[in-house]
Amino acid sequence: MKISVIILTFNEEQNIKKCLESLHQISDDIVIIDSYSEDKTIEICKENNCRIYSNKFINHALQMNWGLKNIEF
């Protein structure tokens, strides 16, 4: 069974690497929905082979629903 993980991010440069290292132990498909970070969040995610999408943040529920609707799993 393939497990996909969705992570919502915004300026998570300080935390995302450790999070991704943990998740790679359980999933090869990590999807990032970023809210136009201004730090190195995207670069770190690219280095860790994540699929990256950007969407304007309104709230957590809408951001997650946007991902579920627009991303192919």
Task: Describe every region a protein language model picked out.
Residues 1-25:
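N-proximal low-complexity "stem/linker" segments adjacent to membrane-targeting elements
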Residues 3, 50-51:
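Short, conserved active-site loop motifs that form the nucleotide-linked donor/cofactor pocket
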Residues 17, 39-48:
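Acidic helix N-cap motif at the loop->helix transition within catalytic regions
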Residues 22, 34-42:
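A conserved acidic beta->alpha catalytic loop
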Residues 26, 48-49:
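Short, structured coil segments at secondary-structure junctions
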Residues 46, 62-73:
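Active-site nucleotide-sugar/metal-binding loop of Leloir-type enzymes
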Residues 53-61:
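Short, acidic/glycine-rich phosphate-metal binding loop used to engage nucleotide
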